[in-house]
Amino acid sequence: MANKTILFNKHLESNAKMVDFHGWDMPLNYGSQIEEHHAVRQDAGMFDVSHMTVVDVIGTDACAFLRKLLANDVARLKVPGKALYSGMLDENAGIIDDLITYYLTDTFYRVVVNSATREKDLAWIAKQSQGFDITVTERPELAMIAVQGPNAKAKAAAVFSADQNAAIEGMKPFFGKQAGSLFIATTGYTGEAGYEIIVPEDEAQALWQALLDQGVKPCGLGARDTLRLEAGMNLYGLDMDETINPLAANMGWTIAWEPTDRDFIGRKALEALRDAGTDKLVGLVMEEKGVLRHDMPVFFTDAAGVEHQGVITSGTFSPTLGYSIAMARVPNQIGDTAEVEMRKKRVAVRVVAPNFVRNGKQAF
């Protein structure tokens, strides 16, 4: 039996095409993936992300524990509500998962991890927490709705109470705040402004309906994938996994090397990889006809005339740009051109930073 979110019936009411997503019945689209994509880039769309795993880490050792668990450093979070993005690494510096951590108080952090990795993540966190004075509590009774797009905040404001709007007024990106029964965060997976709203399950359907009534377009997994790829955001299991270190996944910016005495899990292995040099994740742009796809080989020749090979990790047609884009893991000698093998012939592609669209505009 597949898991169903509390919003399952709301999806059916909007004629969603449901698919299995790592054991969850989730909407692929509600008729047109392209229209849903454009709604987020041009107006406002919303996603049911209630399958995500919310974990509260509470106790006197919460900060110390998360400083060991994560490659990024939660001690950098000084203002209540501030969040950071991090990899959670194994001893070999492989990425167990990528996640967001919110600093709420010195003894209370909220961590949001992926759904596909839930059991593995919870087991790892439980194992590593031994000896720390903390409690780790999963919050399955909470649903989550992401409202994204240039008009998302205004449309959400029409649904929030006056007190809730006052609580989040002027909130900067990458913050979260408890406002009444809602935990409202300025985070997302689309490259647009908006909120991710954690809501008690018994209020989720009413919130979804209220957003629908404000003209927020429901969006499925299809649009979520094209939006996140345009924004250059990794998908766990495709762009990185336990065989990949964060330096090879365009996540170097999420590693807090200082202070040098913070012994986070995987640090020694990661330092060795850094010193030896690793592959890197780049963006590819192909303006010819055709679509770049996961697992296609990428070829380039370095300055010495030696040919190297990499592989596409994620690829799609970009509805915003009108041509194909991809992320690829390649040796770090790559320049600004390469070739991709498609239908037994090689096609030229441009190599760019893995960030294609931000706030509705081309970003490279």
From Swiss-Prot:
Family classification: Belongs to the GcvT family.
GO biological process terms held by the UniProt record: glycine decarboxylation via glycine cleavage system
Keywords: Aminotransferase, Transferase
Origin species: Shewanella sp. (strain W3-18-1)
An MF annotation (GO) of this entry: transaminase activity
Function of the protein: The glycine cleavage system catalyzes the degradation of glycine.
Matches recorded under Pfam families: GCV_T (PF01571), GCV_T_C (PF08669)
Source taxonomy: Bacteria, Pseudomonadati, Pseudomonadota, Gammaproteobacteria, Alteromonadales
UniProt catalytic activity: N(6)-[(R)-S(8)-aminomethyldihydrolipoyl]-L-lysyl-[protein] + (6S)-5,6,7,8-tetrahydrofolate = N(6)-[(R)-dihydrolipoyl]-L-lysyl-[protein] + (6R)-5,10-methylene-5,6,7,8-tetrahydrofolate + NH4(+)
HAMAP family hit by this protein: GcvT
UniProt-listed InterPro entries: GCS_T, GCS_T_bac, GCST_C, GCV_T_N, GcvT/YgfZ/DmdA, GcvT/YgfZ_C, TrmE/GcvT_dom1
Organism domain of life: Bacteria
Gene Ontology CC entries for this record: cytosol; glycine cleavage complex
Name used for this protein in its record: Aminomethyltransferase
Complex formation: The glycine cleavage system is composed of four proteins: P, T, L and H.
EC number of this enzyme: 2.1.2.10
